[in-house]
Structures are given as C-alpha cells and as structure tokens.
Amino acid sequence: MSRRNAAVKRPILPDPQFNSRLATMMVARLMQHGKKSTAQRILSDAFGLINERTGGDPLELFETAVKNATPLVEVRARRVGGATYQVPMEVRQERGTAMALRWLVSFSRARNGRSMSQKLAGELMDAANEAGSAVRKREETHKMAEANKAFAHYRY
C-alpha cells in the first residue's frame, strides 16, 4: 500500500440523458468490453419499458429500487488467532450503492430469455416493490450480519 497521500476520488458526472449520477454509475456497471453506448441504450430502453408498464417516472422508480437493494451492514472475514470470524460491519453509503447496482445488474443478467433491457426493467420494478433477487440478497446479507453479531467486537 502506498505511503503517500490517499488517491483522489474522481467526481462522478451526471448522465447527459437523465441528468443523474446514479444513472452514470449504472451505465458503468452495465458496460461490457468498453461499449458505453450499448450500455446507455440498454438503460434508456429499460427506462422506456418501465414508463410503459407503470406510467410513472422511471428515474424515481430506479432510485427507489437502488435504495431498496442497498445493504446497511455486511460481514467481512477477520482472522483472529488461527480462526476466521465473519465480523458484521456497517457499509459506507458509497459502497452500499455500488453493491446494490452490482447486484441489480448481475441478477438482471441471470434472468431468463428476452433482451437485457427487458430483464433490467423487470429486476428494477421488482426491487422497487421490495421483491426480486437483489432485495433478497440484501436480506440475506443482513441476516448473516445479525447471526454473527457476537463477533461485532472484532470490528476493525
């Protein structure tokens, strides 16, 4: 690890189409092999489908979905005297959002058939309604942290 100053975090610029930082982060997670325009098209198509099906603002639904999938606590492995403990720790807001977006994208990809924009739209609508795989993953993460509460004093 470098002994110099901490790396400066680059500011995330809002997406030109939706004027949202969260949309920019989602495009980055959707992108494969540097194909940003394809990722942007997938997101805008998904938002179009959401608008068709719900009639509401897709950006609002997207923000709700991310909020519902964001974990508050997680477990991290900590080695103490030859034993490895799963230590529950709070998740910083930035990391929680990144985890939620990663889960939403990976579970969208895992859905059956259809185009990626349809799968993403379905996962986002499910997450906004407190359902779906990403929300279930968050609940599992919280349960793991609750089960390992006894090791909370090993926090670092």
Swiss-Prot record:
Keywords: Ribonucleoprotein, Ribosomal protein, RNA-binding, rRNA-binding, tRNA-binding
Function description: One of the primary rRNA binding proteins, it binds directly to 16S rRNA where it nucleates assembly of the head domain of the 30S subunit. Is located at the subunit interface close to the decoding center, probably blocks exit of the E-site tRNA.
InterPro entries per record: Ribosomal_uS7, Ribosomal_uS7_bac/org-type, Ribosomal_uS7_CS, Ribosomal_uS7_dom, Ribosomal_uS7_dom_sf
Keyword rRNA-binding set for record: yes
Protein's name in the database: Small ribosomal subunit protein uS7
Family: Belongs to the universal ribosomal protein uS7 family.
GO terms (BP aspect): translation
Taxon lineage: Bacteria, Bacillati, Cyanobacteriota, Cyanophyceae, Synechococcales
GO molecular function annotations of the record: rRNA binding; structural constituent of ribosome; tRNA binding
One GO cellular component term: small ribosomal subunit
Claim: RNA-binding is one of the keywords in the record: yes
UniProt gene name: rpsG
PROSITE patterns named in the record: RIBOSOMAL_S7
Subunit and partners: Part of the 30S ribosomal subunit. Contacts proteins S9 and S11.
